[in-house]
């Protein structure tokens, strides 16, 4: 151990205590330093060199000397006044705008009002749908890995309408095509399942029956659902329109879909989750499939005129050119050739994007005969085309692993033992449980067709493309001015394929049928001079022409080797007509092998394409917590609203100025109070930030104290372990000495020499503990830890004291307002707010009372006009015969003595009550429940009329009057006993 003089002086316990009572001067000095540092920070913030918020560094790795509170101290008065004024003016402007929108009345609809108030960015369009998580919902969730029905809301009950304006703003009248990965995942699962169980199927018998049949046959139906924050927009109304018309060829580069009505839902409609290739689908899918028969928009299109385009415009869903049916990430599902008929690329595969627009719709089989298209019997024998359309799959189709007839009534099926899943064929070793041989009439069928020239906006009629040797010069058969975009400017007088030089300079091939009908126009920008130079360069065509010869219906050129030029496979010009060389609308100078302008096929789609088509009705969006929308109200509610509107229109009040004044006064008070509270909140927030930062600094200091204490405890534990090791060493030495004594051995050069066996000596532990740490070094380190801990405790105590002081400086809202403003001069009128509110409430009550009185007076005036009408009929009685001559003696024929005194009888109270009650029952006031309280006025009206008739009022008192009654036609009057009768 070291001597007493070499030991460092120990820190007393008194010195280790934090100096809380003796450091008030230090606190004041700290406040002065902090104020100066805050001013420097504020200057740095203005110049952009400092952060506006001080970060908390618990470990002290950065900026130990900068322990700052937030730089935002209480705002100065002029700044607070400017902020208050701006907030006040802004609120008044906003309230004025809102009142202006409300006063517009019927100029806007409910969707527009909601779009005005709600967040216009309530949902975002999701373009990469493959990143959206999705799950299936079905009843058989335990077997197919789906969630149970009820996990998501029913889309038929829970929805929100999206206004048309918002749809146009987000989608720009373009409802795009999406290649959804959800059907591809379903097909991949089926494909993987078939591969894994291929060996197991070979051992099964034909009687084996499993639930997998339901999945393969498409009986497992469910929905696709997306979780929050995603949702689906389900289109309810849509139409198509052409876009980007090519001015050279006239074809539409794009066909866009405009959705005008949509709903936000969580799940799709029910559909088959998985199925193999089939032709006839379930009747539950008919409505969904029929919805994809999209009609043309109500714009000026040539195809809408059935006189020019028989059948009108085409209906269906247009899969755009360039669409990728199976993406590159899942290319193993493509197969060698496309199994979907017209849905294919230019090589008949699915490796490349689509080269031609493909239309898909629910087939209309009303005109079909025995499974063949209309006019199928009129085709050339062996041909697969009729009326300009080439048909695929007529006669035999593939349905649920069977070869089925295209005639749905026959339903003849032959099971092939193979199932097509995508582009792969899998064997099916046992008899399926589904019934294929049945009458499939009424089941929906997909119809896939392509317009190779892509002129659907001009006509829906398909044509047989002309060969080049059948294209001749018109020579007067074509008149007028037409183009590829204006087919109606020309007239033809003879059937044929006429080469025509348009006024724009390009060449046109006008296809005329039935001597007057133009069925198509193909064009190019190449003029006649350029074409004729190419024609003259052809071998042996110097003396030839393109004039029409022959007596055929379409005509032909004189020399077949000198027809309209085109480029061959070597991209060289040639005029030789070939057997399979046709002209196409989009390839005027190329060699085209397709004879017909349209291609069609029925069926041929599996569940993947079936789901893919049905899902095009939906668009994936990303929504917020509260997405705006209009919830459809019941019909009774709409009728009630209509009646209320009519009643309000009938009972419009003229004087509404006082209501507007009240509303403006309330808004002004709210704006002033809001602006004041906003400034108070800013001031209070400044103090709060300062206090919170002080508390954070104090917490950081206490954290450092804890870390130092932990280091000191570790050092003490180390010393204890050293002491324990040394004690253990001494104990080992003592044990060894005892063993030596028992073994009766002695040491010689650190070895024990004994006569006992060497195995006993191996039992003894000869390990020695070596440590260079002395007690003096350990005590010095303990002294250093104590000193450091004392300093940290003082610093932590100071920080806690400063934090408590800053926390006490936080004022409340009203004190902050008093500090920011001089309320005694500016807002001394605030003390009259209760009186103002009471006055406003009194005016409102007075207004309500006046409205009630006005309604009562109006009702009284209407009911008062209903009177009990008294009709007095005076009929003279015939004169006795014996007195007749006596009365006629005066020469006046008795009429002078017929002036009598009228006898009147007043109505009783009961009669007046009956008349009033009958008038009430027959009035429209009785049928409306809002006017039922007016029945309380009936007794007052009855009393008033009774007083008027009985003379109690004085001014309308009845007086006895004499009534002169003419005695004209008195002999025709009936004989009565009384002198007159009151009715």
UniProtKB/Swiss-Prot annotation:
Lipidation, S-palmitoyl cysteine type: 856
Record bears the keyword Membrane: yes
Sequence ranges of Basic and acidic residues compositional bias: 1-20
Gene (UniProt): env
Extracellular face of the membrane: 107-832
Protein task: The surface protein (SU) attaches the virus to the host cell by binding to its receptor. This interaction triggers the refolding of the transmembrane protein (TM) and is thought to activate its fusogenic potential by unmasking its fusion peptide. Fusion occurs at the host cell plasma membrane.
Protein's name in the database: Envelope glycoprotein gp160
Transmembrane segments: 833-853
Stretches the record annotates as Disordered: 1-22
Lineage: Viruses, Riboviria, Pararnavirae, Artverviricota, Revtraviricetes
Residues at the site labelled Cleavage: 656-657
Cytoplasmic side: 854-983
Chain segments carrying region Fusion peptide: 657-677
UniProt keyword annotations, A-Z: Cleavage on pair of basic residues, Coiled coil, Disulfide bond, Glycoprotein, Host cell membrane, Host membrane, Host-virus interaction, Lipoprotein, Membrane, Palmitate, Signal, Transmembrane, Transmembrane helix, Viral attachment to host cell, Viral envelope protein, Virion, Virus entry into host cell
Coiled-coil region(s): 689-739, 780-815
GO biological process: symbiont entry into host cell; virion attachment to host cell
Stretches for region Immunosuppression: 723-739
Subunit structure, as described in the record: The mature envelope protein (Env) consists of a trimer of SU-TM heterodimers attached by noncovalent interactions or by a labile interchain disulfide bond.
GO cellular component labels: host cell plasma membrane; membrane; viral envelope; virion membrane
Superkingdom of origin organism: Viruses
Description of post-translational modifications: Specific enzymatic cleavages in vivo yield mature proteins. Envelope glycoproteins are synthesized as an inactive precursor that is N-glycosylated and processed likely by host cell furin or by a furin-like protease in the Golgi to yield the mature SU and TM proteins. The cleavage site between SU and TM requires the minimal sequence [KR]-X-[KR]-R. The transmembrane protein is palmitoylated.
Signal peptide: 1-106
Known glycosylation sites: 140, 161, 206, 258, 298, 364, 381, 387, 403, 414, 435, 439, 470, 475, 481, 491, 501, 515, 527, 537, 542-543, 568, 697, 765, 772, 788, 822
């Amino acid at each position: 151990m070291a001597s007493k003089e070499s030991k460092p002086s120990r820190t007393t316990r008194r010195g280790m205590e934090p100096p809380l009572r003796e450091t008030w001067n230090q606190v004041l000095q700290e406040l002065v330093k902090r104020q100066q540092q805050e001013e420097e920070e504020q200057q740095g913030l203005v110049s952009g060199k400092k952060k506006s918020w001080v970060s908390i560094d618990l470990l002290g790795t950065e900026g130990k000397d900068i322990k700052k509170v937030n730089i935002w101290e209480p705002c100065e008065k002029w700044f607070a006044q400017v902020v208050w004024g701006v907030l006040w003016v802004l609120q008044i402007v906003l309230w004025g705008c809102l009142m202006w929108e409300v006063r517009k009345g019927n100029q806007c609809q409910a969707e527009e009002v909601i779009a005005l108030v709600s967040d216009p960015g309530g949902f975002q369009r999701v373009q990469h749908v493959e990143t959206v998580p999705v799950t299936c919902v079905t009843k058989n969730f335990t077997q197919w890995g789906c969630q149970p029905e009820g996990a998501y809301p029913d889309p038929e009950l829970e929805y929100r309408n999206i206004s048309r304006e918002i749809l146009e703003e987000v989608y720009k009248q373009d409802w795009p095509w999406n290649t959804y990965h959800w059907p591809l995942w379903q097909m991949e699962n089926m494909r993987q399942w078939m591969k894994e169980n291929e060996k197991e199927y070979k051992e099964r018998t034909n009687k084996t029956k499993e639930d997998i049949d339901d999945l393969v046959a498409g009986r497992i139906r469910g929905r696709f659902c997306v979780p929050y924050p995603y949702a689906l927009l389900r289109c309810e109304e849509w139409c198509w329109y052409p876009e980007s018309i090519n001015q050279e060829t006239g074809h539409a580069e794009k066909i866009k879909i405009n959705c005008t009505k949509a709903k936000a839902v969580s799940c799709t409609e029910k559909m088959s989750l998985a199925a193999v290739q089939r032709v006839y689908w379930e009747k539950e899918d008919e409505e969904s499939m029929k919805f994809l028969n999209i009609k043309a928009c109500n714009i000026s299109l040539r195809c809408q005129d059935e006189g020019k385009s028989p059948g009108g415009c085409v209906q269906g869903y247009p899969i755009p050119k360039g669409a990728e049916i199976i993406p590159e990430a899942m290319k193993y599902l493509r197969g060698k050739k496309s199994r979907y008929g017209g849905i294919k690329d230019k090589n008949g595969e699915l490796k490349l994007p689509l080269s031609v627009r493909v239309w898909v719709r629910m087939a209309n089989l009303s005109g079909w005969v025995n499974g063949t298209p209309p006019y199928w019997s009129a085709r050339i024998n062996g041909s697969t085309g009729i009326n300009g359309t080439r048909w695929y799959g007529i006669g035999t189709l593939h349905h649920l692993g069977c070869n089925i007839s295209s005639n749905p009534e026959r339903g003849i099926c032959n099971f092939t033992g193979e199932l097509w899943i995508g582009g792969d064929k899998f064997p099916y070793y046992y008899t399926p449980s589904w019934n294929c041989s049945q009458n499939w009439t009424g089941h929906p069928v997909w119809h896939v067709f392509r317009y190779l020239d892509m002129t659907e906006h001009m006509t829906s009629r398909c044509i047989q493309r002309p060969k080049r040797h059948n294209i001749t010069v018109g020579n007067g058969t074509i008149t007028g001015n037409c183009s590829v975009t204006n087919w109606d400017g020309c007239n033809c007088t003879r059937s044929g394929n006429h080469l025509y030089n348009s006024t724009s300079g390009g060449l046109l091939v006008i296809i005329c049928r039935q001597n007057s009908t133009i069925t198509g126009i193909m064009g190019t920008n190449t003029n006649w001079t350029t074409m004729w130079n190419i024609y003259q360069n052809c071998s042996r065509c110097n003396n030839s022409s393109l004039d029409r010869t022959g007596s055929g219906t379409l005509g032909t050129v004189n020399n077949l080797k000198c027809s309209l030029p085109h480029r061959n496979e070597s991209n060289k010009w040639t005029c030789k007509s070939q057997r399979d060389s046709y002209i196409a609308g989009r390839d005027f100078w190329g060699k085209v092998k397709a004879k017909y302008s349209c291609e069609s096929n029925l069926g041929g789609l599996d569940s993947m394409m079936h789901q893919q088509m049905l899902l095009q009705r939906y668009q994936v969006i990303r929504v917020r917590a509260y997405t705006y929308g209009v919830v459809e109200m019941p019909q009774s509610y709409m009728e009630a609203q209509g009646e209320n509107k009519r009643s309000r229109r009938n009972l419009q009040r003229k004087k509404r100025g006082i209501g507007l004044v009240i509303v403006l006064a309330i808004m002004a008070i709210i704006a002033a109070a809001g602006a004041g509270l906003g400034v108070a909140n800013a001031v209070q927030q400044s103090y709060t930030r300062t206090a919170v930062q002080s508390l954070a600094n104090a917490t950081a200091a206490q954290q450092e104290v804890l870390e130092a204490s932990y280091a000191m405890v570790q050092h003490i534990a180390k010393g204890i372990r050293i002491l324990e090791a040394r004690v253990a060493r001494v104990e080992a030495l003592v044990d060894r000495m005892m063993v030596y004594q028992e073994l009766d051995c002695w040491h010689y050069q650190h070895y024990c020499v004994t006569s006992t066996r060497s195995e006993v000596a191996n039992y003894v532990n000869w390990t020695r503990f070596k440590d260079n740490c002395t007690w003096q070094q350990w005590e010095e380190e303990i002294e250093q830890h104590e000193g450091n801990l004392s300093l940290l405790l003082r610093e932590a105590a100071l920080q806690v004291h400063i934090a408590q002081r800053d926390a006490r400086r936080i004022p409340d809202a009203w004190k902050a307002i008093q500090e920011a403003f001089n309320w005694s001069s500016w807002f001394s009128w605030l003390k009259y707010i209760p009186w103002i509110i009471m006055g406003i409430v009194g005016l409102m009550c007075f207004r309500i009372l006046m409205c009630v009185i006005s309604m009562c007076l109006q009702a009284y005036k209407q009911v008062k006009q209903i009177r009990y009408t008294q009709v007095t009929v005076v009929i003279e009685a015939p004169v006795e015969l014996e007195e007749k001559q006596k009365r006629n003696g005066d020469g006046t024929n008795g009429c002078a003595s017929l002036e009598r005194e009228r006898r009147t009888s007043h109505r009783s109270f009961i009669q007046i009550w009956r008349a009033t009650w009958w008038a009430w029952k027959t009035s429209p006031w009785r049928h409306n429940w809002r006017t039922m309280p007016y029945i309380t006025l009936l007794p007052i009206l009855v009393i008033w009329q009774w007083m008027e008739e009985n003379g109690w009022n004085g001014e309308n008192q009845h007086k006895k009057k004499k009534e002169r009654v003419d005695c004209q036609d008195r002999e025709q009057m009936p004989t009565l006993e009384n002198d007159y009768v009151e009715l």
